[in-house]
Amino acid sequence: MANDERVATGEDRAWGRLGVAELRIDAASVAPNDPTEDREVVLPIPGPAVSPIPRLTQPPRSSPPRPDAPSDLPRAQREPTKRSPATAGPTEDPNFADKIFKQAAPARKKPRFMPPPKLICGGVTDVTAELPAPSWDRVAEEFGIPDSWKNILAPLVETQRFAKTLQSYNGAKKSGNVLPSQDQIFAWARYCAPHEVKVIIVGQDPYPTEGDAHGLAFSVPVGRRVPPSLRRVFAALKDCYGDGFPTPSSGSLIAWAKQGVLLLNRHLTVERGLPRSHVSMGWDKLTFGVIKTLANDNPRMAVMLWGYDAKTFVPKLPSKHLRLEYSHPSTSTRRPFDCRHFIEANKFLEEGGLQAVVWRLP
């Protein structure tokens, strides 16, 4: 090649790979009178041929003409489009709006009338109808309540609320599984008068074992096996007094009740084998009223609240009384029952001029 031929650069080689090469010619090598004078001429040089990739094409599908497709005929010569009555316009169907609304509106369900609410207590249904308030004389006779508690219990008994409690209790009693027996439900009121109460020990509900519940919280009749929770109470007394509290021969706490210790459960009945089965029967309304009245009337009391249920049951007390809280003595709790409530209660009573309780049992 001539000297004027330029060496192809990397860019030129790149163009060559694409099938086009460039040859740049200097203006001096161009002949005079040539129209390409005084300018750079770029001539394409064929490179390696690159065949284009053929593109596959398919012929357009032919679909049958739609009957409602627009036609090229004049509007006057077109055939009218037939519509179903459901899709006809308002000008074609006079009942168009009614049909559309009937199709769009959902079917209305018939209203369901729920029965009035019911109160279920221990498997017994108590309707919420208004009941006549029972008389104090009838209740005291049926349950064997002494007259010394009339001033406190009569206002709580002669109410429609307690009438519903009695209705629930009478319904549950038909099964024969209610503990304790009816003559022992108010046994806590037989051993001391209201003005003699100086210590209150609050329990949850009676023992659900046949023969254990006899109307006093935590207590069992003579001859019955001492329950585990009561054994832990005796162990706490042993820690407080040492040899001054020998192991009792039974779990009966009647000796405490005769000294003014009110052993009161929050709920007065239970179904056999089902703890806390009568919590919705309404006994707690009556027992709370008893504690509230005693707290207002009595000058000085020590109230022992063991467990969350007892603490929430008696939220407040007048400052003249001593409030003692601790975990429940049940064996299901991990915390040991090592409270010293018995010593603290006696100290509080003696400071007020009252006689201390003899916790020792026969």
From Swiss-Prot:
Active-site residues annotated for this sequence: D205 (proton acceptor)
Xref: InterPro entries: UDG_fam1 (IPR002043), Ura-DNA_Glyclase_AS (IPR018085), Uracil-DNA_glycosylase-like (IPR005122), Uracil-DNA_glycosylase-like_sf (IPR036895)
Subcellular location: Host nucleus
Catalytic activity: Hydrolyzes single-stranded DNA or mismatched double-stranded DNA and polynucleotides, releasing free uracil
Chief location of this protein within or outside the cell: host cell
Keyword DNA damage: yes
Transmembrane segments: none
GO cellular component terms listed in the entry, alphabetical order: host cell nucleus
Top-level taxon of origin: Viruses
Keywords for the protein's UniProt record, in alphabetical order: DNA damage, DNA repair, Host nucleus, Hydrolase
Pfam family of the protein (one): UDG
Enzyme Commission number, as recorded: 3.2.2.27
One BP term from GO: base-excision repair, AP site formation via deaminated base removal
Keyword Flavoprotein: no
Role, per record: Excises uracil residues from the DNA which can arise as a result of misincorporation of dUMP residues by DNA polymerase or deamination of cytosines. Therefore may reduce deleterious uracil incorporation into the viral genome, particularly in terminally differentiated cells which lack DNA repair enzymes.
PANTHER family registered for this protein in UniProt: URACIL-DNA GLYCOSYLASE
Family per similarity comment: Belongs to the uracil-DNA glycosylase (UDG) superfamily. UNG family.
Record-given protein name: Uracil-DNA glycosylase
